[in-house]
Amino acid sequence: MKIIGKIGKGKVEVNEKTKFSILLNNVAKKADIAEGKRAVEDIIRVIYRHQPISTKKIAQKTRLPLPIVAKVRTILEREKILKRTERGAELTDLGKEFAENFLKLKYKKSLTCKTCNGRGIVLDEFFEDILNKVRVWAKRRPLVDTTIDQSFATPETSTYRAALMYERGDLEGKRILFVGDDDLTSLPTALTNMAEEIAVVDIDERILKLIEKFSQKEGVKIKTIKHDLRNPLPQDLKERFDVISTDPPYTVDGLKLFLSRGIEALGKEGIAYLSYSHKPIDEWLSIQKAITNMGFVISELIPNFNYYEGSEIIANTTFIARLVGKNLKINIGDTEKIYTGLVKPVIRYYKCLKCGKIHKVGEEVKKVEDLVCECGGKKFKMIKREKLKNE
Amino acid sequence: MKIIGKIGKGKVEVNEKTKFSILLNNVAKKADIAEGKRAVEDIIRVIYRHQPISTKKIAQKTRLPLPIVAKVRTILEREKILKRTERGAELTDLGKEFAENFLKLKYKKSLTCKTCNGRGIVLDEFFEDILNKVRVWAKRRPLVDTTIDQSFATPETSTYRAALMYERGDLEGKRILFVGDDDLTSLPTALTNMAEEIAVVDIDERILKLIEKFSQKEGVKIKTIKHDLRNPLPQDLKERFDVISTDPPYTVDGLKLFLSRGIEALGKEGIAYLSYSHKPIDEWLSIQKAITNMGFVISELIPNFNYYEGSEIIANTTFIARLVGKNLKINIGDTEKIYTGLVKPVIRYYKCLKCGKIHKVGEEVKKVEDLVCECGGKKFKMIKREKLKNE
């Protein structure tokens, strides 16, 4: 909102406008977030339209990271703009004034299509049946390995991805490679029995074994290859695929690396489905420049397409983009900095569900999977996350 | 489809595969189109899924220009892959074999959401009422001036654009500039009574007069400014808007110019809604590079969002992209080459609806509006379009 020109009629209005303008600036400053005032405005608008609303839902609808939303919400509570009730965040009378008189909000309806949840496509019976099968298999997944930025998409998400590939003509008769597949998108894809060939490269043997068991049981064919993507693809995977699908680590170098391996698989041209986190503009801009420099065009970008299980603090919702490539060229950055934990080391605190003891994960113990409590407990819940400052 | 490796069991299959592969190559070569084999595959897939289907619908679903689709369809008819019935294009038995045995198509359902037609948003009652008003006003539009690439979006399209702006938080309390508005998107936007300020710059006085009449009659405020966008914006429009909306000429220079004028209006940061034609990859890539170089990020891109009236040959459906800008900088190319007619001069043939005489438009007579038949007829129908080769 650009504040320009005449400031209304009376003195009262001038004061209120100035007061709210200063308040907005202060909140943005205190929250210290890349998107500044716009993010604060977005959060207030979403609460105004959907209150009472949970912090997680605010994050989904604003496409802002959950910790940012939580921080802004706390500051807004202190400023008496918001109050927290059992059912979620609500605007106070002051907050309502702020929303209506200053931000000029008045209408509360959401126009997002309820049939498709804004994705633009829906599952028919055939894909619904596939989803039901995927749900069963997804329960057998191992625990996430956060050191390699694992974070599992919901079975619904992976099935919608397969449906989107079908709808756009990128599934029937096509050779498809999954560049990393902790999301198990190869499962619904294989269950369609539409692809000419499906292959998965992943560094995590646990994921590959699950996919192999699945293939055996369901009578489908998925080639699995254990491979560290920091190294070039094996020769027999090169230049033989029509389509690749990836949900890489959410760093610029992670994106460049995974897409480059995808390009090795595609050769000079092909289609890439990229799932990626909503990012602050500066980072977003480097990412889009990297994408176009590799020779990919963004032919479609659907926000809030992907939802994830478990670690909702890290990734609650991301977009999917369909990239069309011609004269593709690989572009690999610093392969040592691809995981977010390496860029910004993170300590996670887990609570033992048996005795309640708090454990640190991220220094000596690297993965929650390696954690065993002194009481013998093996189930934990993440309660806090902390970024370590880089030296 | 990459054709690799083993070619099946028997001799018959080898021959068929080879035959169809040669056929696909030949059709793509004869059609001489930028997207090559993929475009031909896309056309066959859309016919397979939706037959019988009109050429216009094929163009919409494949996002290919109508003349290209018509050309490929004619070649496919000659090759006995397609037949034309009263109800549209259908595959022959040979075509079905081609689709099922070679392209490996088998499933025919469309997963595009029928509620929102793939747009991801729907109009509620409030916006439906607005649409009904816009429909009435749209009937009063002048004839399109094709020398400045006019082509009117449907009232539904312009109302959906306003709805999208609302849904994304870019309407309430915002200052919005329409950089060119032959689509009359300012009308539904103003009817919401949500914006802080609405302004329109356009070179066509007829459009501005209609908007002025509308504002007077409907009691809304839209500032209209007659302006040739090849010149910088008037000083009092600079750096005062939060959001711009544009559907520029579909040339790289047209896009750069219109977005740059938008940046003058926004200042360092802001939101842009860009409607633009689905283009062949090479051109698309220059366009996306131009967008990111100006400092805009594509935060969302919805294909087939916009539909146009009348000149369906030129533009049947285009996408809308929501761009978010930070540290924006203008980037103006060759302002003399912004209109497609100047890049590739086009002759249009119009038939008088009274006497049937055919008239040429594009050389001496520049606009269909200037055309009067010797019989006195003033209503014409475009029947053919021809590109002149540039010297």
From Swiss-Prot, chains A, B:
InterPro entries reported in the protein's UniProt record: BpsA, BpsA_C, rRNA_MeTrfase/Polyamine_Synth, SAM-dependent_MTases_sf, WH-like_DNA-bd_sf, WH_DNA-bd_sf
Q: Which domain of life is it from?
A: Archaea
Species of provenance = Methanocaldococcus jannaschii (strain ATCC 43067 / DSM 2661 / JAL-1 / JCM 10045 / NBRC 100440) (Methanococcus jannaschii)
- GO MF term list: transferase activity; transferase activity, transferring alkyl or aryl (other than methyl) groups
Classification via SUPFAM superfamilies: S-adenosyl-L-methionine-dependent methyltransferases, Winged helix' DNA-binding domain
Q: What is this protein called?
A: Uncharacterized protein MJ0675
Biological process (GO) annotations?
A: polyamine biosynthetic process
